[in-house]
């Protein structure tokens, strides 16, 4: 069992991330990825702690799901707000890792996300957020790693 990790947000243990029922896949949101690949981000240590717990087998996740919209937003944000080096490291990790699973968003899923985006005006969510949620539903993925509150 991994040791607790001290972060600016407090002490983090594997139990902070443990789902209510065991699933082996989880979607990974762009803000989580941005924090993970940007050592200057205030939530970097929290994202790293999660990955440590996954790597050490303390959490059940074996597939970290990303899609075209997640990758685009995370890479662009890393390039513009951190550095091209951080963005390139992120993209190389996706190519080399067996943990990350790339799943393309189908046209039907994207069309549904666009319709919901236009209809639900009371949420402060981006089109990417709606696309990720619709894609998760289509893949039957119950959990997402994100720092957004509107999921």
Predicted segments, located by residue:
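Amphipathic alpha-helical segments within well-ordered protein domains
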Residues: 34, 75-76, 114
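Acidic catalytic patch
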Residues: 98-120
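Short active-site oxyanion
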Residues: 60-63, 99-101, 140-142
């Amino acid at each position: 069992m991994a040791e607790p990790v001290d972060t600016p947000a407090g002490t983090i243990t594997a139990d902070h991330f443990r789902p209510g029922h065991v699933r082996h896949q989880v979607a990974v949101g762009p803000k989580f990825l941005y924090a993970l690949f940007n050592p200057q981000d205030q939530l970097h240590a929290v994202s790293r702690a999660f990955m440590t717990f996954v790597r050490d087998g303390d959490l059940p996740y074996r597939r970290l799901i990303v899609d075209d919209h997640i990758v685009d937003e995370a890479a662009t944000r890393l390039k513009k707000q951190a550095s091209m080096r951080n963005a390139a490291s992120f993209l190389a990790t996706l190519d080399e890792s067996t943990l990350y699973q790339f799943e393309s968003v189908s046209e039907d899923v994207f069309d549904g996300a666009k319709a919901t985006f236009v209809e639900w005006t009371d949420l402060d969510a981006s089109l990417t957020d709606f696309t990720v949620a619709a894609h998760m539903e289509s893949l039957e993925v119950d959990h997402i790693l994100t720092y957004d509150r509107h999921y």
